[in-house]
Every structure is written in structure tokens, then in C-alpha cells.
Amino acid sequence: MPEESSPRRTPQSIPYQDLPHLVNADGQYLFCRYWKPTGTPKALIFVSHGAGEHSGRYEELARMLMGLDLLVFAHDHVGHGQSEGERMVVSDFHVFVRDVLQHVDSMQKDYPGLPVFLLGHSMGGAIAILTAAERPGHFAGMVLISPLVLANPESATTFKVLAAKVLNLVLPNLSLGPIDSSVLSRNKTEVDIYNSDPLICRAGLKVCFGIQLLNAVSRVERALPKLTVPFLLLQGSADRLCDSKGAYLLMELAKSQDKTLKIYEGAYHVLHKELPEVTNSVFHEINMWVSQRTATAGTASPP
């Protein structure tokens, strides 16, 4: 494909022609990352990041999975990281799901016959759930870390939700304030890394994006009774961003025959960047779960 005379650039002014990327159905350029094992991959796994962050924050997890001979791939969602789009704005939450399916389809053309897994954190967990629900039987398994299933009861009271819907009609770009980084993790070093990361969106959650997150919660709740994909669900009991009750709801409603929940008492939201004893356990649980299912997945995922 010939490049434009004036090349498209990332929000950080890097030409996309110099970076791995895809162009979505709306013509937006999305920055991609790939972690490829040295040998022949056993499976593919797409990593779906959370709101306001980017795919680069999954480097350690991706390298661990790559060590299991998985080909790990990801992109920065629209409006995030090094992808195009107004920061933390999306016309409809389904755009995120559509883009994931586009990326998955592209990778399956290059690696036909390999099983495909999903891994999602927070908002990325909701994206993973909706992606799996849209294609029953397509995915070999799913790992969910503190997924968005229920809105935080403190921030989604009936009054606040009603107020947000009214504001969305008149002031959709009004900021509701930035994410409080202190509730992400008890690991102060990780919080400092988050605070100094130039690719993190610090503009604050806009009303219009908050509405899309509420829409996502509604769609996830409707999708759960139809969900049959095997999954591993990891959740912190002290998560103040994604209500831990959502984990129990997911376990109760999902029709999956193979489903596992592990609760980390006292842990916050970003379990893969928590206190060492939590994060080490998270990596171990994911390693064991994925290893067992790649050994038995075969060619479960159609092209």
C-alpha cells in the first residue's frame, strides 16, 4: 500500500509508516505491538488494555506469554496511546470490539489454524467479553484481570448516572476528572511509573466516554448468559474502579463450563502491577491456566 505524501502521524508526531499499525473501518490508524516467540507459535493471544492506558503497559505479561510459545499481539484502542482519535473518546463502545475482531482476523490469515485467546484488563476486560460473545465458539479461552462488569457503586449512583445522561446531551466533553492513580495499586513504585508515563491520558474522563462505559456495562450484562468461552478471572477484593461484585456476577451468569475465579484479598485494581506477592501469583495463575489450555486447544478456533 503506497504511503501518503504527507504521512499520518501518531499523537506523538511519529509517522505511522515507521511503526506497526492497522487502519480500522473508520480510517483511523491504530498503533500495534507484536511479541513473537523464536519458534513456531502454539497459539495467538490478543491483549486488550484498559481506559486511559496503552498496550505498552503489558510488556512483562506479553513476554511471559511469549515464553510459552504464544504469539502475543495488541493495539492501542482508538483515542489511546499512540493511536489516532480524540483522547478517550469513542463514538460507540462497539468500535473497540470491531477493531479487535479486525486485528484477530488479520492475524488468523497469517497464522491459520492456531487457537486464539483473549486477555483483557478493566475496560479491556469488557471489550474481551463482548468480543468473545460476538463470536461464540471462536476463541479458545479468555483471561480477565479486574474486568469492567459492574460500575463502581460510588461513582455510578442513580443520581450520578442520570446527571451524566443529561450532561451528555449538553456538555459531552465536560471532564469528570482524572483517574485517581492511588487506587490502581498498593505498589507505590508502579503508581509512580503510571504517573510518569507520557502515553497515559491525563485529560480526565469525559462525560461522553463515561456514558460509553455505562453502555458497555449494560451490554456485558446482556452478553453474560450467552458466554461459553473458557475463562480465568482474577479480581482484587479492594478494587475501587471495577466493583468486585462483578466478578461473582460473571461467574454466576456465564454459561462457560470451564471457568475459574481467584480473589486477591486486599488487592487493588491493577493486579499485574500490584505488590510482588500478588503480581507473582497473577503471573503464575495465568501461566498455568494458559499452558494447560494451549496443550489441549489444538485447532479449536476456526479461521
Curated annotation (Swiss-Prot):
Pfam family, any one: Hydrolase_4
CC terms in the record's Gene Ontology section: cytosol; endoplasmic reticulum membrane; membrane; plasma membrane
Main location group: cytoplasm
Compartment list: Cytoplasm, Cytosol; Membrane
Gene Ontology molecular function terms on file: lysophospholipase activity; monoacylglycerol lipase activity; protein homodimerization activity
Miscellaneous comment text of the record: Short-term inhibition causes analgesia, while long-term inhibition causes tolerance to endocannabinoids acting on brain cannabinoid receptor CNR1, and a reduction in brain cannabinoid receptor CNR1 activity.
Protein name: Monoglyceride lipase
Originating species: Homo sapiens
